[in-house]
Amino acid sequence: MIYTSAIEHMHPDDGAKSLVECYKVMKPGAKMFLSCPNTPGNGYNTQYRAHVYEWGYDELKAKLAEIGFSIVQEVGLVSSVREMDDFYAKQEPALRDFYTRMKSYVPAAFLTAFMAIPFPREAKELLFIVQKPKGESINA
């Protein structure tokens, strides 16, 4: 199931209900790809005017677990060069050096996407790959 760029256009109660409905209709073992902005703190302080509520990493991860999803993978998507610079400046020397080398080889448009992948909590956008456990009934 693909669920992308939608949950942020709903009130958080409705977004949570939509996730429950996804869980209900998924077959056991099925996966869902869920992407959305990552906005820690007050989700009503949105990055984009068209959005109603933007879930933060911890909040969304907890809600997915509460519903019953198993998290298969978490991926950071899209971040700005400035944010990546700030983030990597605080890391261990080897990681800082790796980032500095990558900046010299990779165009900024690709760098921001590539370097955000392993750090979903810090990324501007999230991709959660979740699964309905194989032992669950279809109408759980």
Q: What are the language-model segments listed below?
A:
Residues L60-V78, Y105:
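A SAM-dependent methyltransferase catalytic signature shared across enzymes that methylate proteins
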Residues D13, D58, P93-R96:
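Generic alpha-helical secondary structure signal
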Residues G76-A140:
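A C-terminal cap/extension of S-adenosyl-L-methionine-dependent methyltransferases
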Residues Y44-E59:
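Acceptor-substrate binding/catalytic loop of class I
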Residues P37-N42, E54, L77-S80:
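Short "lid" loop at the C-terminus of a central beta-strand within the Rossmann-like core
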Residues P12, E54, P120-R121:
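Short, solvent-exposed loop/helix junctions and linker helices
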Residues M1-G43, K61, F128-K132:
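Conserved SAM-binding loop
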